[in-house]
């Protein structure tokens, strides 16, 4: 094969980037990277985590044949992690779904029937009948949708419009409820606005990194490579890692801390106390920009109201707080002494002091990173609030190199679930359904009758499971998520509702996942670059990509499914007469005409697409649907601190971080000179709050919902591994990734294994009060739990670890605690 100098340079760049990450480039990429004439390359964000790496996608003869890190992408600078290099293969699993499948017996739908291929028209016929029957007999609260932080921005926006405006049901929630809801509520309580104030550029300027429940080495490996480079190139940089078990991020740690589950709350309050006792408060910042409040306590665990823990709670679900003085706050945290903290957490005193000194040192720029260890926590909102306290006490916030940073796990948990507002309580740009002014803004922009959007918060993810089981939610559509494997307490709270004859379950998925196989109707879905899309990553960076290949068979994008299904409903079938009377011109129109084919959305012609540019949805409809939806959605945030750039700018750029004002992105929010919403002379302004001040909350330690006892004597924590992403529905179909980690194992301390007569490689039954699974004992390897705790990843469909987990949630965010429940082991 003859290579040009340019091709040779590019091939070497790919190989060098892979070597830097300790990775090998897949053979297909090595073979084709030099064949520039034969392969068409275009940019896209990676399909996996919330880091938002940029990749170059190589297509040839209608297939994705190669992928490489994009050297022009500022996030990853040409480097991919092991999953990123195998992106092409996620789309071509042997069991890819290519036509709708309905459970049928004797030629018609039957709950106990076999999956049978049908047409899209037949699929929509059945869905139409089920939706209309439920709406007529029981109203909008009987239907629901479970979406995703993997939806594109316009897919999430279209879904939210269809349910909240079209069907008048707020029973739509994303799987980001399971991963980012506590971060959202934490941001809103402390700052009045969602999402981090900093960016990834902080990494190269920080003096210290503190990881709170974040195994970045495996879950955010590209960011970890940048942290590693910073640490190894500067001897004065410090890394502290906190977790309930030892993992790969500990290899870089100067201070690796293992604490008793739930006791991170104690450590956070201890550090606040240390800062105060050592006169390390930034008095100028604190006096000008911070308020103090005492939060309600004993708030329960988000379980069913009949559960003993909920009955015993004094303030179940309370988000209340009251002002407090600094002296009262000082007295509150004073109880968290070094001695008490060491006793409650099991952490040596010297390690606690070293950690506290990082925050207290005025000359150290500190970044706090966290993911699921904080968020999947029955006091996850509190944990978020408490880490903000440390940065607000010291003024280490909204400046280069320092600040609190909540990392996301999905590619558009920020851009779609949070910013678009696909949660059951949210609307675009941090607006909420309970606020009449916010509903009015949306109704006017969408040109629908006043009062269309319900004021009542819809069912969140766990509540949807309970409502299905109780027969209150009867038609349920899930998209771009595998909740039958990923959600908690499968046996008791999810499977019964899905298989209840009263309920009809639709799953849109590219593969026959656990969720798809438990459904009644499966709709084949287009993936990644088989559609035009947009994601928003953890640093507020919005990134676009173009459709680069077509989906196989009859697979259709989630956007196509939503828009086409909306044609089946006329306004008089979904809206009461009193609403129609307010806008009689909408009578007789379909929801497609009212929500999507509006003058506002349909005004961008197909001529804006290049003649050879793929865009299946727009070409079928006759207008540039994605641009119309995006520009309508972006209107909500412009001028309100959520400013997005014009649509076309994103196709030219490698992403832009909002707010984007006058063509300039924002790296650090809330600080003068960095944020266009902070005026000269203000210094800092947390403009999500009416008075421009952030809030420090006094919040105590409260125990976990379930802890080990004499019978169930071990903590169980669940999570991920580097090679697989979430439930493995994509990565397990990549042969190389599957071989690297073919099945889940139970990581256990050698002494705990020995005490139970277990050896590495033995089969073991893991049992909780809710279910049991068979796994494989692992006493070595990357994850090393302390005595008393075991760890299992949840990627393996043959080992449904969420049969074991408890459906306890943070009462404020409704996010599930997947990190703490009690189990026992039985040798098989």
Curated annotation (Swiss-Prot):
GO terms for biological process: cellular respiration; Mo-molybdopterin cofactor biosynthetic process; nitrate assimilation. Its main location: periplasm. SMART domains: Molybdop_Fe4S4 (SM00926). One of its GO terms (cellular component) is nitrate reductase complex. Residues 39-95 form the 4Fe-4S Mo/W bis-MGD-type domain. Binds 1 [4Fe-4S] cluster. Predicted to be exported by the Tat system. The position of the signal peptide cleavage has not been experimentally proven. This is Periplasmic nitrate reductase. Substrate binds at residue 794. Pfam families: Molybdop_Fe4S4, Molybdopterin, Molydop_binding. Component of the periplasmic nitrate reductase NapAB complex composed of NapA and NapB. It is found in: Periplasm. The lineage of its organism: Bacteria, Pseudomonadati, Pseudomonadota, Gammaproteobacteria, Enterobacterales. Its cofactor is [4Fe-4S] cluster; Mo-bis(molybdopterin guanine dinucleotide). Mo-bis(molybdopterin guanine dinucleotide) binds at residues 83, 150, 175, 179, 212-219, 243-247, 262-264, 372, 376, 482, 508-509, 531, 558, 718-727, 802, 819.
């Amino acid at each position: 094969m003859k290579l040009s100098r340019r091709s040779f340079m590019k091939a070497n760049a790919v190989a060098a980037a892979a070597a830097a990450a300790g990775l090998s480039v897949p053979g297909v990429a090595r073979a084709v990277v030099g064949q520039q004439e034969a392969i068409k390359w275009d940019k896209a964000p990676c399909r996996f985590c919330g880091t938002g790496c940029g990749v170059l996608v190589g297509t040839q003869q209608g297939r994705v044949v190669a992928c490489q890190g994009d050297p022009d992408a500022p996030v990853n600078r040409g480097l991919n992690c092991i999953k990123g290099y195998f992106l092409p293969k996620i789309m071509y699993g042997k069991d890819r779904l290519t036509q709708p499948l309905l459970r049928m017996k004797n030629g018609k739908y039957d709950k106990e029937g076999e999956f049978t291929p049908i047409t899209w028209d037949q699929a929509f016929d059945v869905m139409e009948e089920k939706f209309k029957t439920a709406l007529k007999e029981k109203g909008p609260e009987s239907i629901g949708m479970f979406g995703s932080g993997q939806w594109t921005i316009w897919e999430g926006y279209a879904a939210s419009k269809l349910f909240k405006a079209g069907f008048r049901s707020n029973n739509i929630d994303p799987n980001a409820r399971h991963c980012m809801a506590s971060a959202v509520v934490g941001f809103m309580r402390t700052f009045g606005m969602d999402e981090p104030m900093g960016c990834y550029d902080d990494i190269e300027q920080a003096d210290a990194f503190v990881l709170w429940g974040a195994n970045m080495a495996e879950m955010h490996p590209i960011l970890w490579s940048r942290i590693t480079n910073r640490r190894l190139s500067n001897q004065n940089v410090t890394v502290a890692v906190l977790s309930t078990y030892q993992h790969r991020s500990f290899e870089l740690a100067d201070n690796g801390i293992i604490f008793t589950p739930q006791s991170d709350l104690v450590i956070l309050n201890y550090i606040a106390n240390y800062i105060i006792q050592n006169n390390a408060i930034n008095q100028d910042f604190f006096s000008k920009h911070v308020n103090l409040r005492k939060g309600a306590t004993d708030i329960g665990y988000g379980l069913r109201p009949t559960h003993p823990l909920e009955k015993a709670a004094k303030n179940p679900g309370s988000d209340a707080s009251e002002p407090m003085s600094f002296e009262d706050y000082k007295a509150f945290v004073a109880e968290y002494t070094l001695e008490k903290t060491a006793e409650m957490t099991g952490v040596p005193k010297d390690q606690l002091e070293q950690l506290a000194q990082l925050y207290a040192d005025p000359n150290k720029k500190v970044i706090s990173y966290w993911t699921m260890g904080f968020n999947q926590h029955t006091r996850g909102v509190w944990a978020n609030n408490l880490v903000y306290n440390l940065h607000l006490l010291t003024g280490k916030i909204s400046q280069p190199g320092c600040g609190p940073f909540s990392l996301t796990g999905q590619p558009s948990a920020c851009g779609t679930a949070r910013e678009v507002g696909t949660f059951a309580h949210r609307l675009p740009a941090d607006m909420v359904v309970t606020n009449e002014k916010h509903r009015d803004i949306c109704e006017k922009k969408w040109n629908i009758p006043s009062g269309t959007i319900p004021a009542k918060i819809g069912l969140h993810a766990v509540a949807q499971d309970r409502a299905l089981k109780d027969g209150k939610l009867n038609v349920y559509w899930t998209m771009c998520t595998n909740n039958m494997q990923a959600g908690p307490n499968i046996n008791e709270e999810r499977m019964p509702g899905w298989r209840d004859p009263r309920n009809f379950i639709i799953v849109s998925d590219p593969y026959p996942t656990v969720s798809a196989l438990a459904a009644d109707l499966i709709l084949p879905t287009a993936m990644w670059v088989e559609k035009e899309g947009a994601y928003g990553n953890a640093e507020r960076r919005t990134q676009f990509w173009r459709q680069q290949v077509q989906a196989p068979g009859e697979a259709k994008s989630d956007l196509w499914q939503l828009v086409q299904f909306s044609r089946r409903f006329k306004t008089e079938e979904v809206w009461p007469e009193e609403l129609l009377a307010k806008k009689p011109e909408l009578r007789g129109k379909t929801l497609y005409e009212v929500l999507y084919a509006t003058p506002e959305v349909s005004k961008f012609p197909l001529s804006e697409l290049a003649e050879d540019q793929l865009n299946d949805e727009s070409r079928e409809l006759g207008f540039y649907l994605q641009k119309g939806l995006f520009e309508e959605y972006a209107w909500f945030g412009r001028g309100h601190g959520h400013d997005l750039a014009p649509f076309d700018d994103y196709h030219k750029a490698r992403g832009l971080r909002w707010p984007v004002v006058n063509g300039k992105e924002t790296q650090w929010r809330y600080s003068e000179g960095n944020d266009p919403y902070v005026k000269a002379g203000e210094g800092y302004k947390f403009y999500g709050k009416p008075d421009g001040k952030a809030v420090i909350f006094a919040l105590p330690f409260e125990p976990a919902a379930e802890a080990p006892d004499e019978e169930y004597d071990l903590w169980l924590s669940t999570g991920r591994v580097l090679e697989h992403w979430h439930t493995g529905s994509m990565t397990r179909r990549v042969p190389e990734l599957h071989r690297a980690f073919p099945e889940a194992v139970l990581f256990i301390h050698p002494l705990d294994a020995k005490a139970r007569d277990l050896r590495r490689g033995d089969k073991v039954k893991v049992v909780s009060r809710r279910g049991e699974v068979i796994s494989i004992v692992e006493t070595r390897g990357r994850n090393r739990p302390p005595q008393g705790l075991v760890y299992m990843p949840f990627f393996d469909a043959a080992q449904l670890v969420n049969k074991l987990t408890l459906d306890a949630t943070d009462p404020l965010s409704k996010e599930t605690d997947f990190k703490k429940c009690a189990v026992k082991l039985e040798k098989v």
